[in-house]
Amino acid sequence: MLEEEYQLDYFKEQGFTRKICKSCGSAFWTRDSSREDCGDAPCVPYSFIGSPVFAPHTVDEMREAFLSFFEKNGHTRIERYPVAARWRDDIYLTIASIADFQPFVTAGVVPPPANPLTISQPCIRLNDLDSVGRSGRHLTTFEMLAHHAFNTPTEEIYWKDRTVELCDQFLASIGGDLNKVTYKEHPWIGGGNAGPSVEVMIGGLEVATLVFMSLGRQKTSHPGYDLNGEKYYPMKLRIVDTGYGLERLVWASKGSPTIYDAVFPDMVSRVMSSAGISHLLENKDYTKILAMNARFAGLMDISGSNLFNLRKKVAAAIEISPEKLDRMITPIEKVYAIVDHTRCLAYMLGDCIVPSNVREGYLARLVIRRTLRMMNEFKMQDTLADLIEEQMKIIGMDKFQQDIAVVREIVDREVEKYAITLDRGTRIVQKVAKSYKAKSQRVPLAEIITLYDSHGIPPEMIKDIAAKEGAVIDLPDNFYSQIADMHSESKKEAAPDKTAGYAERVSALPPTKKLYYEQPGDTEFEAVVIDFFDEYAVLDQTLFYPEGGGQPADTGSLVGSDSMARVDDVIKVGEVILHHISGGVLQRGERVKGMIDEERRFSLMRHHTATHILLHAAKAVLGVHIHQSGAQKGPESSRIDIRHFKHITPDELRKIEIEANRMVMANRPVEISIENRTKAEQEYGFALYQGGVPPGKDLRIVKVAGDIEACAGTHCRSTGEIGAIKILRVEHIQDGIERIEFAAGTAAVYYMQHLEQIAASSADVLSVQLENLPPTVTRFFSEWKDQKKEIERMSQRLVELEIQAIQPESIGGIPVVVKRIDLAPRELSSIATSLSEKGGVALLATPGETARIVLASGDARVNAGDIIGQLCSLLGGKGGGKPQMAQGGGPEVDKLDLALNVGRERIIAALQKK
């Protein structure tokens, strides 16, 4: 399909010929009429290794060459987006340059930041994580050089011919021979869109892909195209989506054995030296092997188990065993992977990702721990923090938000956590391995994934420990890639829909006018009932705020001509607002008076505005990486969850509280405006999206004392209206997430009054003035500890005296004591244990509200656990323990002597056995 889409005037004008590859059967375009292959590996081998196809360029030189070229050709250069895709709610990491403009620009909802534009966008893809270092070409992080044009029905920028022409011209500008370039046809499908595309080949290497996004799933009058069994139809917006691999262009310009040698020459040298293997790259035999390895890798799919097949092919070519080859080049491959991974981490941590067990934080920790595992094998001189810092310096510290000192602290803490994981992981894996071995089963992949996901235990460690236990595990070569794929996209659980079944009815209603935005200080209004069904009232306008953004709905009442109804919930469906009422019936067309619960509304406004202030204060105290993970506002108290790499200390909490209240006392105005999404993102950055990504071309921007967010809630008119902000507590709810609970305004005053009341009551109990309470409590506590020590000393002395006074009877040469003693259960256990350690048997009991009984046995014939169970049953209770020591009790104290007698008989019977 789409064959006609490739019949470009540019191809005809430049003398291109459309041919079919003799190896793969794909169509391609070439200036060389004698050519029979498409130019793509594996149809042809890499020919650029040792024979560069472009003039030599460093990474910086190639990036500037590309961006400058497109600037000269009418494109606007824009700055890169962060690698944490916080403007998206479906993916965590930026995986392509077009992801910068999805979903709103590509859907035509908002205009692009420039048109046409050019960008060099760092991207992170972890789906080939296991191949990095081993294939010679795979990377976790790469820069996608791109130029994009967004064509609309009213404005044509450029399309296919100009895109291919620009590609030709750029490749020629960096020294490429255009007669060696091929354009391979390859229809593109992704994310509900499709279109023709061409892959650009030279020297056996794909250096760019030119995608012409012009088809979508939305049905039109056009008959459509069948692609992979689905129908696609022409879109109104036609998008030029190009991607040139910066690192691949540099590799092809240098002809190095691997992409790592071309892109990271200084870092490869440093890590080789730190690992103590720098001499290997000085060996020409190794260089040849690495180049051959990369060539063969280009000829095959090396994912999964095929990595071993790659080893076999290279080993056969140089006539050594795969095992010997593995020993030779594995250390170098691990160095390559370490270099790649540390650049990936430089971008992740520099762009304020906090390692954790969720979202993008999970992926950061995945890369950190994989890097640490490889570094630990070398016992390197450099630390992980050292290497990441160096990568950040190479990229440019000005390219990152995060301070290097914070990055180092984050990394050092992750190193400590990893060491703890390894220490405790051995016992966990041993238990699992023994379980499967006992069942004569292999340890399945699902179990290994659970051990990694739940406990952080690396698969290599699992494999080694399982082998020692005699268990076999199923561990694929691409384990880390599978894990990364599992966690690369947001998996949202659908919230219960309160209005399920009403969609069609609501869609026919006009939008509700939102008075709560226009008149947030009002509490009464008049409106007309547009519709009423199933206890839901729809009005033409409303002051009632619907639940959303972590803010609960307003409550209140609606008064009609004949009845008054209580509004207990308010929800928004599209642009229509539904009021759930109880205790009344409203009629369509009826005019009603609405009354908001004033105290609740204003308390929610104060708490919502205070949430903004606390977030800003937390950033000021803890660092720029602070990002909201969740929030819930309430009239009495609220909470905000933030991403932070360690527990918040009491001192930090005090500083946050002071900073927040300073902002309140400054009485700065709260500014609310409606702004174009694209312009707002460019001006304020993606920290706008603290509470999620709202839809639409415009954003409601709320500015509160330095905090700027896209927010739909109700807010105070100035920070001074909030009143006091009091932090109630901080809680570590999960790794990398801290929860701050707080109260604002009157609620904060109520809380402080409550604390004062507790303090005053405590002072009354101790008969001291309130200001003398702390030293008095300290003195009492110190005295209590001294008295506790004295009591323990006296108790120990009582035990010693009791032991001295006891006269055991001898049964078969074994000293036996059966006695009631009025001591605490702890002392009973101590006495019984002391006697059993001398080879005797002691059954001791003490009365009280419930009877307590203990049996300690120094003779294997007397099983304490068995006997104590029977005795406790006599007392109406339960007991148990081990053969050497058991205890218990029961409420029937009057049967204590009976229990002791039965116990004595059981002991004697046991000791009389041979």
Curated annotation (Swiss-Prot):
GO biological processes: alanyl-tRNA aminoacylation
Cofactor(s) needed: Zn(2+)
Annotated SUPFAM superfamilies: Class II aaRS and biotin synthetases, Putative anticodon-binding domain of alanyl-tRNA synthetase (AlaRS), ThrRS/AlaRS common domain, Translation proteins
Compartments it resides in: Cytoplasm
Listed GO MF terms: alanine-tRNA ligase activity; aminoacyl-tRNA deacylase activity; ATP binding; tRNA binding; zinc ion binding
Primary localization: cytoplasm
Domain of life: Archaea
A single Gene Ontology CC term: cytoplasm
Gene3D superfamilies given in the database record: 2.40.30.130, 3.10.310.40, 3.30.54.20, 6.10.250.550, Bira Bifunctional Protein, Domain 2, Threonyl-trna Synthetase, Chain A, domain 2
Cofactor: how and how many bound: Binds 1 zinc ion per subunit.
Keyword set includes Secreted: no
EC code: 6.1.1.7
Keywords of the record: Aminoacyl-tRNA synthetase, ATP-binding, Cytoplasm, Ligase, Metal-binding, Nucleotide-binding, Protein biosynthesis, RNA-binding, tRNA-binding, Zinc
Pfam families noted in UniProt: DHHA1 (PF02272), tRNA-synt_2c (PF01411), tRNA_SAD (PF07973)
Binding-site positions, Zn(2+): 608, 612, 711, 715
Reactions catalysed according to its record: tRNA(Ala) + L-alanine + ATP = L-alanyl-tRNA(Ala) + AMP + diphosphate
CDD domains for the chain: AlaRS_core
HAMAP family, per the entry: Ala_tRNA_synth_A
Comment, domains: Consists of three domains; the N-terminal catalytic domain, the editing domain and the C-terminal C-Ala domain. The editing domain removes incorrectly charged amino acids, while the C-Ala domain, along with tRNA(Ala), serves as a bridge to cooperatively bring together the editing and aminoacylation centers thus stimulating deacylation of misacylated tRNAs.
Role noted for this protein: Catalyzes the attachment of alanine to tRNA(Ala) in a two-step reaction: alanine is first activated by ATP to form Ala-AMP and then transferred to the acceptor end of tRNA(Ala). Also edits incorrectly charged Ser-tRNA(Ala) and Gly-tRNA(Ala) via its editing domain.
Family: Belongs to the class-II aminoacyl-tRNA synthetase family.
Name of this chain's protein: Alanine--tRNA ligase
Gene symbol of the encoding locus: alaS
